[in-house]
Amino acid sequence: MIEAFGRTDVGRRRKINEDSFLVSPEASLYAVCDGMGGHNAGEVASKMAIETIAAFIERSGVEKEITWPWGLDANLSFDGNRLKTAVRLANAKVFQAADNREELTGMGTTVVASIVTGKSITIASAGDSRCYLVRGGELKQLTRDDSWVSAALGEGILNSDDVEHHPLRNVITKAVGARDSIDLDIVQHELQPGDLVMLCSDGLHGMINDQEISRILGAGDAPLEDASARLIEAANESGGRDNVTVVLLRQPA
């Protein structure tokens, strides 16, 4: 059975933790959401998204006659369709809550969510929360940031040296609840024995770079509780400007 552990920390600068995460081995579901919005609305958005995603994934795993509100996408696997529908349901719920309650206006959340079935991992993402893979001591980012700097980098407007300190580095171009509909990035990868997968908010990768993350995770064989604690400690020691959340999964060797 896959090994998993999650940890979150408010960081050094914030008073409220607006990140939420889920570790559910029973549903083979793992997720990180990084909420945004004033008056604690980000905390509401991230929790609402996690709860909505979990509810649909759990139901779709056991109910044969479940309703698919937007139908099924023939280009996606069953798990891909489950994640796509779950996040779209979360988007609708967060958007409606923000529209109905003045104190929640403008709230939203990033999401990175994964289902592990056998040797396959399916990942859905929106925003700048990330999924990484450590295999053979090598770190690889499996998701693409939905952010202004990522788009500018892809279009050649910026180079990689500009990104780390760019004033728009925290501006995301996609979030759950920001609009009445959402397009998701969904990818699928085959896992190998001993692979380590990490889901994280930008409170981690925005404070320490990939080289430092790779150094801390090493070969990916350290106890997950220890590795997550070291990652969060490093983010906080680098300034801790944001909430930081890490979920680690390890495929049995």
List where the protein language model places each region.
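PP2C/PPM-type serine/threonine phosphatase catalytic domain
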Residues: 1-253
